[in-house]
Amino acid sequence: MKMKVFLMFVLLFLCSMGTKAQDLGANYNENIDYPITEIEMLKQSKVSWVRGFVNIPNLFLQNENGKIVGVKENAIRTHIPTLKFIQAKKALGDRVKFILSLKIPFELYTDTVPKVGTKEMEYIFQATEILLKTYDMAKNIEILVMGNEPEWENALDTDLCHADGEDYRAFLNEFANRLTTWKQANGWTFDIYAGALNRVSELPKSETVPAVVSVVNNNPNVVGLDLHVHALKINQAEDDFRIIRDKYGVTKKLICTEFSMVRALNPHVADALGEWGTKHGYTAGMKIYEYLNLIAEKANAGTPVSATEFKSLFESYSWYPKNWYKTFYEVFKKYDTYAITGRFSVVPGGARAVYDAKTEMWELGGIYFSRYLGLDADGFYNPNPLLYPDFIAARDGLAVSSLVGGQRELFISWGNGADKTGILSVTDEEGTEVVRRSLDSENDYTLVENLAPGTTYHVALLKSDDAVLWKDDVKTKSVTGKFPLLKYQQVDGYMLVQLLNLPDDVSSYKVKLDGQEINIVNKNLNGQILTAEVTYKDGSVEILSTTIRK
């Protein structure tokens, strides 16, 4: 019997959650270099998604007299924030999915939306293709969103009613088709979304909204729509989603990569503390922005105010929309929103280093709040007491805590919201139910094996009468190489071992940790050497080995 031996090293991916409907995530907007600085916070928070955007014209296009005249190729290939974005993805691993939005504000760089076929539009596509290839960006994102609030960025006047709707529709259709061609040529698997529309219930005359929706509804290369909700009133999230689903008839996936109630808060940034102030050791005449500056200084000095004090201030005002995060999340659930990314952290410094009477209070929408409430005993950011309880309730109430797909297997870690008397159903692309089993009441996970690589499966948790408790569509990983690869990652307290790229002539394999045989889902995380003995039908054995990295 001959022996084939390979020594392979892979990284341990410490991450938190996977993809299913209503997954929560972290939005970093243009600060795509920030996630790498908050890896431990992202792990601790158990978010499922990380989202950022890139301003294509501002960063990567040459502009002269309101016309796009070229591409800054070197600027794209040496863009350090792009590299850091990808480094964060690799540090977080398979279960945290990344979303990249492409911000293309035509109003600032051209007189109108360029026509399809013009040099200006070709420059946009050229820059995008180079960006997607740089640092393997395209291979590390799950979703690519074409556009970012185009109602404002394409508008030619202040009423937002004349925004080159037809030209923008043509642009998005051509963009989606180009992206699909690149995907096919390069083996990229990200999903294409259009968006991100904002305030749709306030813009009944907008040309841009129906143009974007038309592309979503009619272009088969577009998977769904990104919908932002920056609301003035707490019921606006419901209004926006209802209009998209009912009036415009969008049946494809929805995601929400930005949401806030900052517009309801901004008019009050200079409100006085009043009676609350005198009761808590401040003056009645102190303004909210002055209070925020003061407590930021205290947090920076290591003597932050208490979460109770901070929360009580805002809840003393009748205008503050209590539990707005919970209200929004209920809307996201109702309309089956696939991914939800809100502001994650508020740290010292940044664009709003000092507040004044005109500062917009975006930061009150952050989940973690070290700028105002400092760090806890373990060095982690203290949370925002106005939102954090609702964030935790939403996160921990999910039916699925983690969902990790390999090439031939699917690992599901059940969350607190799962009905353990339920039935797991897995259906293939032909509509054939390939798995139907009751959940194991003794285990908090389910491992589904013997799936086909590169195949989309519909996975659902059902009641006994087949009523759906939770569902998602999951695509197994495609075979990407000729040689077997041993991989592992930590998933909710388990080690999940995956053998990738196994050829058809494999008859069996064994996985061992420090010489002791283990299952591919293993509770022991304390070993040092992980090996897999792969036996082929001709009797040969291939040994794969990797060192566990803590």
What are these regions (language model features)?
Residues 459, 530-532:
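Hydrophobic beta-strand segments within extracellular beta-sandwich modules
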Residues 146, 172-209, 253-263, 337-345:
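Aromatic-lined carbohydrate-recognition surfaces of secreted/lumenal glycan-active proteins
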Residues 197-226, 233-240, 265-274, 347-361:
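Substrate-binding cleft/loops of secretory-pathway carbohydrate-active enzymes
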Residues 50-52, 100-102, 142, 148, ...:
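Aromatic- and acid-rich polysaccharide-binding/catalytic face
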Residues 397-417, 453, 470-494, 546-549:
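Pro/Thr/Ser/Gly-rich low-complexity, intrinsically disordered linker/stalk tracts
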Residues 39, 45-66, 76-199:
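Substrate-binding cleft and catalytic face of glycoside hydrolase catalytic domains
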Residues 259-265, 270-397:
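Substrate-binding cleft of secreted/luminal carbohydrate-active enzymes
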Residues 448-452, 522-524:
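Short, flexible loop/turn segments at beta-strand junctions in immunoglobulin-like
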